[in-house]
């Protein structure tokens, strides 16, 4: 399982140039929560992982559990 910082890096790569506010609103989470996930200081609850995965049209496993990452 990847470390929180690796997951955060994945989330930042997925977001790209999209404003953090847009992703947070679409996932129904706060901007500060998304920032903490992207910085690796927090791991989202399972419910939030599903929302994030659905937003990016990827599986929860792909984003949060795979050791290898390719965008």
Per-segment meaning from a language model:
Residues 28, 47-62:
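DNA major-groove recognition helix of helix-turn-helix/homeodomain DNA-binding modules
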Residues 10, 33-36, 62:
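Residue-level recognition of specific faces of alpha-helices
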Residues 28, 39-41, 68:
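Residue-level detection of the helix-turn-helix DNA-binding "recognition helix"
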Residues 12, 21, 50:
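Active-site phosphate/pyrophosphate- and oxyanion-stabilizing loops and adjacent acidic/basic residues
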Residues 62-71:
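Short amphipathic recognition helices of helix-turn-helix/homeodomain-type DNA-binding modules
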